[in-house]
Amino acid sequence: MAKLISYAKGGFLRNTRLTSRAVPQVYQHATSSRGFVHLTSSVAQSSAIHVSTPSTPSLMLIMGKRTMFIQTQDTPNPESLKFLPGVEVLGKGNTYDFPSVAAAHCSPLAKLLFRVEGVRSVFFGSDFITISKEEAAEWGLIKPEVFAVIMDFFASGLPILHEARNNADTEILEDDDETVMMIKELLDTRIRPTVQEDGGDIVFMSYDNGVVKLKMQGSCSSCPSSIVTLKNGVQNMLQFYIPEVESVEQVFDEADKMADKEFERFERNLKQKDTSSTAPVGIGGGPAN
């Protein structure tokens, strides 16, 4: 997401209007720290974990045992982490968001990942899996379990999704006017790939009276900088090429709203506990008068 902001501020926008496929080139640079973990599947009766290097093949067969090199990559959201298994997950350009365990009914892999304690949400990309954790959870405890789940699942040969599904939000429809078509084109060809590099996705919801409504997914859904990304990155880019766009707004679905309510309730309970623990205690253990 930081790439979109720096791109909009860095003067990389060409002084041309967006037509058909005339879209801006995104300035890309490596900003994320990466880790490599070599796992030997427990299906192959081994649980060895070794440090690997970027040049090591992602998937190989050694002495009849299936091994996988899983790469981890930080995201702008400290509560989200990308896992790159070195093999295709959903295929180029495809994503699937699982904001809660209830949404994982169509994916055996997502169900298994939600069983890992501390996992809050799961997101599948073309060749990566983004895990978002609870704030109190620690990556040091979550990562080994996620590694094991991914390794065992890919060794099993089970389908990742019960039903194949392509992203349809940017598909050009018969009733789309020129403005909507240009918005979808720019989102699909330049903005979405950049956001997916950060372990998330951006979904077109609607356009009406100059307002573009978008939904953030994956690491971007709860990222502290998501609003800044929308305003300083996505909105500026859309407005430059499509003057009809007046503003960009983020929308939330029911799962997002429920998660926010649960978090607010959790915070209130913590504050109440803190207040009761610091209150003066009288004789007999009751509050002092």
UniProtKB/Swiss-Prot annotation:
One of its GO terms (molecular function) is iron-sulfur cluster binding. One of its GO terms (biological process) is iron-sulfur cluster assembly. Coiled coil: none annotated. Disulfide bonds: none annotated. SMART domains: Nfu_N (SM00932). It is found in: Mitochondrion. One of its GO terms (cellular component) is mitochondrion. Keywords: Iron, Iron-sulfur, Metal-binding, Mitochondrion, Transit peptide. Residues 183-251 are annotated as: NifU. Gene3D superfamilies: Fe-S cluster assembly (FSCA) (3.30.300.130), Scaffold protein Nfu/NifU, N-terminal domain (3.30.1370.70). It holds the Pfam family Nfu_N. It comes from the Eukaryota. Residues 267-289 are annotated as: Disordered. [4Fe-4S] cluster binds at C220, C223. The keyword Iron applies. Its main location: mitochondrion. Signal peptide: none annotated. Residues 1-56 form a transit peptide. Belongs to the NifU family. Molecular scaffold for [Fe-S] cluster assembly of mitochondrial iron-sulfur proteins. This is NFU1 iron-sulfur cluster scaffold homolog, mitochondrial. It comes from Drosophila willistoni (Fruit fly). The lineage of its organism: Eukaryota, Metazoa, Ecdysozoa, Arthropoda, Hexapoda.
